[in-house]
Structure formats: C-alpha cells, structure tokens
C-alpha cells in the first residue's frame, strides 16, 4: 500500500519547535480597551443545512466585517510567548448568553473577563448540570489572519451533550458566531505563529436555582479564552502512561460519551496517583472485561501495528473527539488503513507506535505504557514515523500552512 509522503513544503521544525520567524514583540499601549463593535460581523458559508436538532450544519464559513471603521484589537499582548504553557492567562473579554426554561437564548454580549454571580442552589453546583467544549484558534504564518479549527463540530457535540443532560443549547450558528466574536475581541491574545494557540472554552451551565433534583430553570452559555502552549510538560516529547486497573472513567449507559463536567472530576484521583509516581497520565480500560482500551483522562488513544492504525470505537463510553475524528480522516487521505474497533491491552503492549489525540494535546506520542508493573517502551524518545507524518499534516491544516482541501478551517479576517 502506497502512502502519501510528508508534505515537502512544510518545515517540520516549524511544527515541532517554536518559530523564530515572528519574534518581534508588539507591546500593548493599554489593557483597558473598549469592546470592538461586532454588529457587522457575519458568518459566510458556502453551504448549510438545518439539522434534525434544529441547528445549522456549516460546511465552511468565514468571518468578515462589513464595517471597515470597526476597531479590532491588532497588537499582541505583552507576555513572554516563549514560556506559555497550558495554564490560564485571562484575556480581555468573555461572551455571555442566557436562556430561560422555554429554551430560547437571549442575545449574547461581550463582557470584561471576570467572576460571575451564581446562586448557591444553581443546578450546576448542586447536581452537576453542565457541559464544556474546547477548541483552538491559530495565527497564520503571515501574522494577520486567524484560523478556527472545525468550530461547528464543537457546536454539534455540545448540542448532543445538552440533550443527554436535559439542557437547551445554542444552535450551531449561534455557537460559531459567539466563538468568532470572542476570538476577535481577544485577538491580541492569539500567540504568534509557532508559539502556541488561543484555547477557546465554551461552557453551558444550569445556573437557575433548584432544590429538588430537576433540570434548572435558567441556563448560561459562556465563552472565555486563554493563550496556551503544550498541554503536557513533556511538550512534543513522548509521554508515559499507566494503565488503570482499579478506577474507571465511564460505564455503558452513562455519560462517558458527552463532555459533561462530572466526567473530568471523576478522573482526578487516578490521575493524581499516577502523576505522583512519575507518569504523565492514565489510560483507562472498559469497566466490564477490563481488557479493552477506552481513553486517556483528556484525550483519545491510537495504536499502530504494521502500518495499520487502530483506535477504540465510539459506543457511548468514549468521548467522540474532534481531533480523533480529524486524525482518522487525515490518516485515510494519507493512504493508511484505519480501524475503529475494540482494542485490547495486549495489542497495546505489542504495538509499533502509540499516540494520543485531543484539542489540548493535538497529537502526543506515547513513549511508554506500564501495565501491571510491566513497562513497554515505544520509539526512541521522539515521534514514530506514522504519528509524525499525521501530526505534520494535521497541524499544517490547523495553522494554514497547506491548502485546506478538507474545508475544516474558519478564516477570521
């Protein structure tokens, strides 16, 4: 089987190491900026269709401003872009939109980033009625244009999760417009090319007061952003995982397949134990047979054997990752055979390569896996051949380094 080679036009060092091509720091004259006007911002898309859940399925869209006098934030925030890790660095603005029990969302607005007021009896605080999403914005190599990666997929996933959690959710169009406004309002926080990305965090919460167990009478949709670098402290170096035997992330019929807030608090115990032992994160097994791979705490898992790529199938206990979905499509366009199926822990231990995917990690090679005291290593302290090829193509698409034939990116110009 012939596979497409790594794109020769892409400098892989640009993807694997911070770029020095955009090193000039532009200093902000003031942080107390007035919100830019977004009344004229429209979403243009080549085609759309109304989905069964009432949202609009966008195949491609571009954000443009029809008012040339609108003032957008163009300078970069005055921070050390070379040391940006994956921690919160509050930007200027957040987006807030309310919804009452009838399911209709009011017009959202940009507010200065800050604390919110919430009732002690809010549904999200008492019963965990909340969802979140995560996506990224990248500054293109020219330093001007900004790209969003598949925001409509996050919108659809939030709507699916909201249905499971008995919550109303913004339409796909409302979601994408809100993300667009928020990113443009915080444009100066989008890192220079090669220095990281702007992490976008949409939240949907039951903020109405309840006492008995019931859906909240009011909901709040919030988006905030933060510039980020690599998720794992290892950066793009391989991570070390431990397979968890005692704790489980999800059960059949539960909420493992949606991005509800409770799924993540539940993994903190096992993750803390693993990190105390020197591991990067935890790989979970299914809770019934305890032999099939599920996922890592915050990302999906892939194995490679004889150039065949395998990943656990989506069946309700694994989050349908957008990076996972994108990686599968990229791999197939590169000529690889990809299987979505039950993957055993024994296959993991015999794999040629192992890697993780997720919005936060993008693609992270796995250097070792420890299972019942047995440690198996992969590669030689760097990306494997297959994972490096896929990483190069995917990140090149995300950063606008190659033509987006997949129609995945949204150009904010």
UniProtKB/Swiss-Prot annotation:
Induction trigger: Diurnally expressed.
Primary location class: plastid
Mutant lacking the gene: phenotype: No effect on the levels of free amino acids in seeds, but reduced levels of Val, Ser and Thr in leaves. Increased levels of Met-derived glucosinolates in leaves.
Keyword Chloroplast appears in the UniProt entry: yes
InterPro entries cross-referenced by the UniProt entry: Aminotrans_IV, Aminotrans_IV_CS, Aminotransferase-like, B_amino_transII, BCAT-like_C, BCAT-like_N, BCAT_family
An MF annotation (GO) of this entry: L-valine-2-oxoglutarate transaminase activity
Entry cofactors: pyridoxal 5'-phosphate
NCBIfam families: ilvE_II, PRK13357.1
Family assignment from sequence similarity: Belongs to the class-IV pyridoxal-phosphate-dependent aminotransferase family.
Record's protein name: Branched-chain-amino-acid aminotransferase 3, chloroplastic
């Amino acid at each position: 089987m012939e596979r497409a080679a790594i794109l020769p036009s892409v400098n892989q060092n640009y993807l694997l190491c911070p770029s020095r091509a955009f090193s000039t720091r532009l200093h902000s004259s003031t942080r107390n900026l007035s919100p830019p006007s977004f009344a004229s911002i429209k979403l243009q898309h080549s085609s759309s269709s109304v989905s069964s859940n009432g949202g609009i399925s966008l195949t491609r869209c571009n954000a443009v401003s029809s008012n040339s006098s609108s003032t957008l934030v163009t300078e970069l925030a005055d921070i050390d872009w070379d040391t940006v890790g994956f921690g919160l660095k509050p930007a200027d603005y957040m987006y807030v939109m309310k919804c009452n029990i009838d399911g209709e969302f009011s017009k959202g607005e940009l507010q200065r980033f800050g604390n919110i007021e919430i009732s002690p009896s809010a549904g999200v605080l008492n019963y965990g009625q909340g969802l979140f999403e995560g996506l990224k914005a990248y500054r293109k190599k020219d330093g001007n244009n900004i790209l969003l990666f598949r925001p409509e997929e996050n919108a659809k996933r939030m709507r699916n999760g909201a249905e499971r959690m008995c919550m109303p959710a913004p339409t796909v169009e409302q979601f994408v417009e809100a993300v667009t406004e928020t990113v443009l309002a915080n444009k100066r926080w989008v890192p220079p090319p090669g220095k990281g990305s702007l992490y976008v965090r949409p939240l949907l919460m039951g903020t109405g007061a309840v006492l008995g167990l019931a859906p909240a009478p009011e909901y709040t949709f919030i988006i905030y952003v933060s510039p980020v670098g690599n998720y794992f402290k290892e950066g793009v170096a391989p991570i070390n995982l431990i397979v968890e035997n005692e704790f489980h992330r999800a059960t059949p019929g539960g909420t493992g397949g949606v991005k509800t807030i409770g799924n993540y608090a539940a993994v903190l115990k096992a993750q803390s134990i693993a990190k105390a032992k020197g591991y990067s994160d935890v790989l979970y097994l299914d809770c019934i047979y305890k032999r099939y791979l599920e996922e890592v705490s915050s990302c999906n898992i892939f194995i490679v054997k004889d150039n065949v790529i395998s990943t656990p199938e989506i069946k309700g206990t694994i989050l349908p990752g957008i990076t996972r979905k994108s990686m599968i499509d990229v791999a197939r366009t590169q000529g690889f055979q990809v299987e979505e199926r039950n993957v055993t822990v024994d296959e993991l231990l015999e794999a040629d390569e192992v890697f993780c995917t997720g919005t936060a990690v993008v693609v992270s090679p796995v250097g070792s896996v420890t299972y019942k005291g047995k440690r198996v290593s992969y590669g030689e302290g760097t990306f494997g051949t297959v994972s490096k090829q896929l990483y190069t193509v995917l990140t090149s698409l995300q950063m606008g380094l190659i033509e987006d034939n997949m129609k995945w990116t949204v150009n904010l110009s």
